[in-house]
């Protein structure tokens, strides 16, 4: 390949279904030697589409590996034949040692067998002719249970080695690199699952703990990574496949964008809110305009958001304390809809990390709650026991138990569950409440927080959902319903480290009342 001309390189691109890159490679006069010398940054500048970037980098890497110790063929067709032969051999090895043949669970980033299941972007992966070759090419990209971080560029590695807090531009570089790496493992799909986002962010923070700023770094990096994927998907948002995916997951629900008249009405309403609530100075007015502009961006500057939210905390607390309507407050400070910002505001008010506390509660008390006398025959508990029979993975079982614990809390304490969580019904209460869909399916489960009968935010898991529910009551100074007081007393007792509650287990209750299980 080192001796290839520009024409030979272009011929090779066509053979690899990358014909769209030919014109650009001809313009830049990329010969074989130049092709092998390309680094990640050069590929990003040379190739527009992220899927093509990932495939091209992978092909170059594969070629270098296959030609080590061998003389590079001068004919590109011979080189392609060598690569295809190696790929076929890899695929046969993969088939014989595939975990699926031994009943093992597939890792979260293992490429799906059905590559046309609606999540693959057809514009990125065109002319897919041979699924086996794609699986063979991705053999080197199969993940173990724990995600392995990619090799970062030199300047990023220097910054990480010095443990310096990255600035905004450096954060974007890290996120761009992680997103490109994820796209390779996902075979060009631009729709990672929640678990895949969690795997990547957890690996980043475990390798570089200093990036976990104030204990909230997980949400910060995960949000930034999601925003990056949204940004990459933007050029294809009019594609039929993307539109179907959006409809499937409830995006816009078929509504059109706001008209100019509606936008103008909102602007007038904001002016009225400012005049009625408090005396706004020019600096605060600038913050509010910045929030509203930043909120609609795909890639957000979360460090600047944190800074400005801290600067406006005092006036925001005054407005909430003076009973300014919550809808008006959320128009002025739209980032309060984000769970991460709610958690941060809660921490500023109470000096307590509510997410960590909530996770600890669900992990520590799930066994006691699920075996308590009051919920042993609850339909949720029965469904949980049935679902658990189909899984052996410890992480999956733990997640399912924590989810059931979250849903059953009001039943354990004799409170009204309809004020806490709604399943398969329309939200009727005005106080904060959770809406849950498919709770025991990690891939498609959905938790939404509602406030005043309108969806405030959608979250990914039961820990974030429960933490957001508790935080909403405190951040917005909403009085807890009397029929939910015992449940919140339990949660707040543990969140604020007051004392440990006691649960009568099923076995203890049986001893007290001589309870007998019905024979089955």
UniProtKB/Swiss-Prot annotation:
Matching InterPro entries: SAM (IPR001660), SAM/pointed_sf (IPR013761), SAMD3 (IPR042812), SAMD3_SAM (IPR042813)
Gene3D superfamilies: Transcription Factor, Ets-1
SUPFAM superfamilies: SAM/Pointed domain (SSF47769)
Domain SAM: 4-71
Annotated spans, Disordered: 85-114
CDD domains referenced in this protein's UniProt entry, alphabetically: SAM_Samd3 (cd09526)
PROSITE patterns: SAM_DOMAIN
Protein name (Swiss-Prot/TrEMBL): Sterile alpha motif domain-containing protein 3
Encoding gene, per UniProt annotation: SAMD3
């Amino acid at each position: 390949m080192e001796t290839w001309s520009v024409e030979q390189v272009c011929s090779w691109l066509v053979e690899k279904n990358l014909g769209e890159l030919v014109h650009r490679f001809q313009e830049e006069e990329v010969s074989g030697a130049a092709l092998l010398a390309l680094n990640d940054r050069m590929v990003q500048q040379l190739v527009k589409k992220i899927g093509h970037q990932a495939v091209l980098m992978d092909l170059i890497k594969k070629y270098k590996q296959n030609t080590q110790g061998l003389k590079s063929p001068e004919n590109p067709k011979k080189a392609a034949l060598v690569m295809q032969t190696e790929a076929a051999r890899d695929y046969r090895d993969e088939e014989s040692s595939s975990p699926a043949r031994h009943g093992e669970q597939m890792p979260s980033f293992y490429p799906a067998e059905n590559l046309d299941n609606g999540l693959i972007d057809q514009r990125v992966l065109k002319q897919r002719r041979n699924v086996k070759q794609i699986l063979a090419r991705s053999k080197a990209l199969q993940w173990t249970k724990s995600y392995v971080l990619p090799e970062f560029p030199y300047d990023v590695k220097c910054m990480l080695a010095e443990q310096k807090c990255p600035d905004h531009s450096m954060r974007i570089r890290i996120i761009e690199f992680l997103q490109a790496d994820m796209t390779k493992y996902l075979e060009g799909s631009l729709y990672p699952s929640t678990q895949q986002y969690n795997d990547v962010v957890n690996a980043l923070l475990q390798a570089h703990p200093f990036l976990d700023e104030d204990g909230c770094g997980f949400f910060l990096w995960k949000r930034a990574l999601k925003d990056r994927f949204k940004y990459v998907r933007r050029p294809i948002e009019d594609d039929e496949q993307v539109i179907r995916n959006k409809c499937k997951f409830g995006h816009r629900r078929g509504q059109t964008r706001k008209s100019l008249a509606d936008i103008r009405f909102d602007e007038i309403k904001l002016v009225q809110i400012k005049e009625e609530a408090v005396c706004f100075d020019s600096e605060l007015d600038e913050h509010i305009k910045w929030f509203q502009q930043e909120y609609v961006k795909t890639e957000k500057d979360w460090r600047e958001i944190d800074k400005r939210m801290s600067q406006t905390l005092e006036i925001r607390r005054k407005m909430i304390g003076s009973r300014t309507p919550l809808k008006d407050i959320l128009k002025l400070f739209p980032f309060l809809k984000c769970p991460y910002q709610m958690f941060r505001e809660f921490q500023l008010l109470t000096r307590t990390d509510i997410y960590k506390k909530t996770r600890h509660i669900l992990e520590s008390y799930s066994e006691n709650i699920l075996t308590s006398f009051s919920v042993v025959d609850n339909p949720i508990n029965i469904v949980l026991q049935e679902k658990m029979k189909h899984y052996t993975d410890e992480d999956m079982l733990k997640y399912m138990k924590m989810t059931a614990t979250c849903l059953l809390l009001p039943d354990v304490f004799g409170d009204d569950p309809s004020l806490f969580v709604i399943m398969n019904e329309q939200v009727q209460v005005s106080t904060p409440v959770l809406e849950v869909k498919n709770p025991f399916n990690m891939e498609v489960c959905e938790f939404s927080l509602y406030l005043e009968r309108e969806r405030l935010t959608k979250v990914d898991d039961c820990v974030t959902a429960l933490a957001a529910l508790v935080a909403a009551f405190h951040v917005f100074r909403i009085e807890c319903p009397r029929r939910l007081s015992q449940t919140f007393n339990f949660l707040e007792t543990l969140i604020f480290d007051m004392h440990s509650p006691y649960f009568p287990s099923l076995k203890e209750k049986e001893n007290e009342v001589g309870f007998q299980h019905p024979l089955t």
